[in-house]
A protein has these predicted regions:
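Charged, low-complexity intrinsically disordered segments
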Residues: 1-138
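Hydrophobic alpha-helical segments and helix-packing faces
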Residues: 20-27, 36, 238, 300, ...
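Acidic/polar N-terminal loop/beta-strand segments that form early-domain functional surfaces
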Residues: 48, 152-154, 195-199, 205-206
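Flexible, D/E/H-enriched segments
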Residues: 137-191, 206-306, 317, 339-436
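Beta-strand elements within well-structured catalytic alpha/beta cores of enzymes
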Residues: 191-197, 289, 322-330
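Catalytic metal-binding/acid-base residues of hydrolase active sites
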Residues: 199-201, 332-333
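Non-transmembrane, aqueous-exposed alpha-helical and coiled segments at domain scale
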Residues: 309-324
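Divalent-metal (often Zn2+) His-rich catalytic cores of metallo-beta-lactamase-fold enzymes
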Residues: 330, 336-340
Length: 436
């Protein structure tokens, strides 16, 4: 089904949504640049020259030069960002708001002193609202999830590839375990990969610790993790699908952080290298999805599994015929710190792989303590696999999954390597619906 955007029907109102954000991204970032005295002085000295240094559309520049806030809003401006511009010019919020109503400043102030604008006469027309809420026809075409890939994202694996060590005796067994996977991926190239990973203190430090981060930008460069960026292609995003997913997941009560700019580290690039090899450009678009598994509390397996189910609904309600894969990365058992560093638990890992296939809902109930005790402090990354598993159609009985490949190997640096490919075979009734 299409997403509910009836907020657009409220008269005289611009709700700043993903469409507005995309349209006005550089306009609003320009406004943010005015938060330093030096930049404010430069702007006031030559407004046109300052604006020309930004990748703004001419309509956006003209709106600012003409002091036309309604035009700036139509061009994607947000009032809180535009307030920085207004403050630079000496405007108050009342002056800015009043300028958009057709009233003089004195008339607007008098209205506010008198109690403000009444809501009567400023609501949505009921007939228009009822028509908007009429049951829409399901999309003729929609995106489908074709499969899930689960894999460890060990940084040393990326280093082995980058330094031509893949044929060394230590590393050869690891890469042999992905030979089938690369062939499968060549035969099943998706349009988009929704790639679940965790950042390793590369894009996020302790000044900002979001739980779930959805990459909504057009491009994501490779992070420098202390050794220089990996020599791999940057990632091309899919802002339209990402915006749709954001709207759907947040509507389903998952609180996301949206990142229009984001560098991606080995958590994302190593899985791509393992599945696609050494390429000049990744063969599909990638939507990064970061999960905090670094600082407790981290999301539970149950929450991640529920998010995966909601993700499937989001993707299948997108009205473009895209093939989408969902990847869950990280793990398996490993501990990188403390006297227990080096912990590996083969038995637990393989039981996890078994249950991931046959009992994902039960596996989602495993508590954090078991992950840490049995799989090591960094083994908690495995909750991210449950997002990808929750997105498969067998979870709600509307399809089946097929195991195409399974691989497990120790050692790979400090970590047990696990890998699984599930093909998704939904039935043809239509997009998924339902509750979390």
């Amino acid at each position: 089904m299409s997403l509910d955007k009836t907020y657009k029907l409220v008269p005289g109102t611009t709700v700043f949504d993903a469409e507005q954000s995309a349209k006005g991204y550089h306009l609003n970032q320009f406004c943010m640049s005015l938060m330093t005295a030096e930049n404010r002085a430069a702007y006031l000295a030559d407004e046109r020259a300052y604006l020309d240094a930004w990748p703004l559309r001419e309509e956006q520049k003209r709106a600012l030069l003409d002091r036309d806030l309604n035009a700036a809003m139509r061009e994607g401006g947000n009032i809180y960002f535009l307030a920085k511009w207004g403050a630079t010019l000496g405007f108050s919020f009342q002056q800015m708001a009043g300028s958009m109503t057709g009233m003089t400043e004195e008339e607007y102030r008098a209205m506010m002193v008198g109690g403000g604008r009444p809501v009567d006469g400023n609501r949505i027309d009921h007939a228009v609202l009822e028509a908007a809420h009429a049951d829409p026809a399901p999309p003729v075409e929609h995106a489908v999830i074709t499969g899930a890939v689960f894999t460890s994202h060990v940084p040393a694996i990326g280093a082995a590839m980058d330094h031509a060590k893949t044929e060394e005796p230590y590393w050869r067994p690891v890469f042999e375990g992905y030979a089938f996977s690369r062939q499968w991926e060549r035969e099943n190239v998706p349009d988009v990969i929704f790639l679940v990973y965790n950042d390793h203190a590369s894009a996020f430090d302790l000044s900002l610790i979001p739980t779930f981060v959805l990459g909504t930008g057009a491009a994501f460069p490779t992070a420098d993790e202390g050794y220089g960026p990996r020599p791999v292609p940057g990632v091309e995003g899919d802002p339209d699908l990402a915006a749709h997913i954001a709207h759907s997941l947040i509507r389903d009560d998952f609180d996301l952080t949206l990142a229009n700019e984001l560098t991606v580290d080995h958590g994302l690039t190593v899985p791509l290298s393992l599945m696609f090899g050494d390429v000049g450009k990744w063969p599909c678009k990638v939507i990064p999805f970061h999960v905090n598994v670094v600082q407790y509390p981290v999301p539970s397996g149950a929450r991640c599994f529920a998010l995966g189910r909601a993700l499937r609904r989001a993707i299948e309600s997108y009205d473009r015929p895209l093939k989408v894969q969902v990847w869950g990365t990280g793990g398996m058992s490993h501990q990188l710190q403390g006297p227990r560093a080096g912990l590996i638990n083969r038995e637990w890992d393989n039981a996890f792989l078994d249950r991931l296939v046959t009992d994902p809902a039960g596996l989602a109930g495993v508590p954090h303590l078991e992950y840490v005790e049995e799989a090591g402090s960094e083994g908690i990354e495995l909750v991210m696999w449950l997002i990808a598993r929750g997105a498969m159609s067998d979870v709600d009985g509307t399809g089946d999954v097929e195991v195409k490949h399974r691989f497990y190997h120790v050692p790979a640096s400090n970590t047990a390597v696990g890998h699984l490919i599930l093909e998704n075979h939904p039935r043809a009734e239509g997009p998924a619906e339902g509750e979390n």
